[in-house]
């Protein structure tokens, strides 16, 4: 089975769906919103071609569920707010939004939510239906998605860590697995494995930057948010917990060791310095803003659908309930790729053990994601300067 067929979130609206388990990502978007607003402010001041008539925006790796349209709403509201601040008396521009993700993404569930979004934008922003046009653009952001110099603003949240393929070189010339008992480039992985993952990320991210530079207008903006390498004090990350859970099943004889050794997740969390160096070496973009922030990976447990902190309940301080919440999120992201390799029957057992291990980490006050926000502007052509 092709990687792109299984590298997607759980669709639909069931209990294991991404739509039902993405409150953590809502919190990330809320943290990024002030930077998004500043990005839009700089974009509108740059006075790009046609920007007063139609602003073209894309969400790269949009996934499905309410978070997809939360990004759209935040972008539209930021545009309208900044225009008001600038006392722009011209007629509101149409905003054209493209939602992009791999072909297997559940775009249909997103389309079902559009009427509600349009009503909300009309009520809160006075935007009449038809002044914000939303369409899907299925495809991989590791290749071209849009015509040359056609876009004003590109946004991506929590997608860039996914690679276009499992790195080559993870099996030796003798047919021996180089990344034994591991499922990604962990701290315990041998140096050749870590290098293979870094090389693949470098290739993918450099290609991503080059493709986006071709699609953006000169001085267009791009805002990226991704997980980056953390510190020792953060504790094991969720990929470590997933790896532990699968290893537990191998020890119990529920899974064969060869099945584990042949499984590698196409994901790489780069360091801040790696990302910064790659942007500078590719050369198409200027870094306008770069910041990191930490979030506990159970942070989404304590917020409601509007990103407000819920009143404390007996469950709030229960590490097992919080760990189960984290397990549900990770299952909604990785179940398709896990089920394609290990089979669907073992999935509940994997995430039962995941939750058990996560509870131990949470009890110790550890378990953090380190996040990177980076705002970029496409460098002007010499003729535009």
Swiss-Prot record:
Alphabetical keyword list: Magnesium, Metal-binding, Methyltransferase, Transferase
EC number(s) on file: 2.1.1.-
MF-aspect GO terms: metal ion binding; methyltransferase activity
Entry-linked SUPFAM superfamilies: S-adenosyl-L-methionine-dependent methyltransferases
Domain of life: Eukaryota
GO biological process, one term: methylation
Site (Involved in substrate discrimination) residue list: 155, 267, 344
Broadest EC class assigned to this enzyme: transferase
Residues reported to bind caffeine: 158, 161-162, 238, 369
Cofactor note: Binds 1 Mg(2+) ion per subunit.
Disulfide bonds: none
Biochemical pathway: Alkaloid biosynthesis
Binding site for Mg(2+): 179, 261, 263-264
Pfam families named in the record: Methyltransf_7 (PF03492)
Cofactor(s) annotated in UniProt: Mg(2+)
Residues involved in S-adenosyl-L-homocysteine binding: 18, 62, 67, 101-102, 140-141
Sections of the chain in a coiled coil: none
Similarity section: Belongs to the methyltransferase superfamily. Type-7 methyltransferase family.
Protein task: May be involved in the biosynthesis of caffeine.
Name recorded for this polypeptide: Probable caffeine synthase MTL
Organism: Coffea canephora
Taxonomic lineage: Eukaryota, Viridiplantae, Streptophyta, Embryophyta, Tracheophyta
């Amino acid at each position: 089975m092709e990687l792109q067929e299984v590298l997607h979130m759980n669709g639909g609206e069931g209990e294991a769906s991404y739509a039902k388990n993405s409150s953590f990502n809502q919190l990330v978007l809320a943290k990024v919103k002030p930077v998004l607003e500043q990005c839009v402010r700089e974009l509108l001041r740059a006075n790009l071609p046609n920007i007063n008539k139609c602003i073209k925006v894309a969400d790269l790796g949009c996934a499905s569920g309410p978070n997809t349209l939360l990004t759209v709403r935040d972008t539209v509201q930021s545009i309208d707010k900044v225009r008001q601040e600038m006392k722009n008396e011209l007629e509101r521009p149409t905003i054209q939004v493209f939602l992009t993700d791999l072909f297997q993404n559940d775009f249909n569930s997103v389309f079902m939510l559009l009427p509600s979004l349009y009503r909300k934008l009309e009520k809160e922003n006075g935007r009449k239906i038809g002044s914000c046009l939303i369409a899907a653009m299925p495809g991989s952001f590791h290749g071209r998605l849009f015509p040359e110099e056609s876009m004003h603003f590109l946004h991506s949240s929590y997608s860039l860590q996914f690679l276009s393929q499992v790195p080559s070189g993870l099996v030796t010339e003798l047919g021996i697995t180089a990344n034994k008992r591991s499922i990604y480039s962990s701290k315990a992985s041998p140096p050749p494995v870590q290098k293979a993952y870094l090389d693949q990320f470098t290739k993918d991210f450099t290609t991503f930057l080059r493709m986006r530079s071709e699609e953006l207008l000169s001085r267009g903006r791009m805002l990226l948010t991704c997980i980056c390498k953390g510190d020792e004090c953060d504790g094991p990350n969720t990929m470590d917990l997933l790896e532990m859970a699968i290893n537990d099943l191998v020890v119990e004889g529920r899974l064969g060791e060869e099945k584990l050794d042949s499984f590698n997740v196409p994901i790489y969390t780069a360091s801040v310095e790696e990302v910064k160096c790659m942007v500078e070496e590719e050369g198409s973009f200027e870094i306008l803003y770069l910041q990191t922030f930490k979030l506990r990976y159970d942070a989404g447990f304590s917020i409601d659908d509007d990103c407000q902190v819920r009143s404390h309940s007996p469950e709030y301080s229960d590490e097992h309930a919080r760990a189960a919440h984290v397990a549900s999120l990770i299952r909604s992201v990785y179940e398709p790729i896990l089920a394609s390799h290990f089979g669907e029957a073992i999935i509940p057992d994997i995430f039962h053990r995941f939750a058990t291990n996560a509870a131990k980490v949470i009890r110790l006050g550890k378990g953090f994601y380190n996040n990177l926000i980076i705002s970029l502007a496409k460098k002007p052509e010499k003729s535009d300067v």
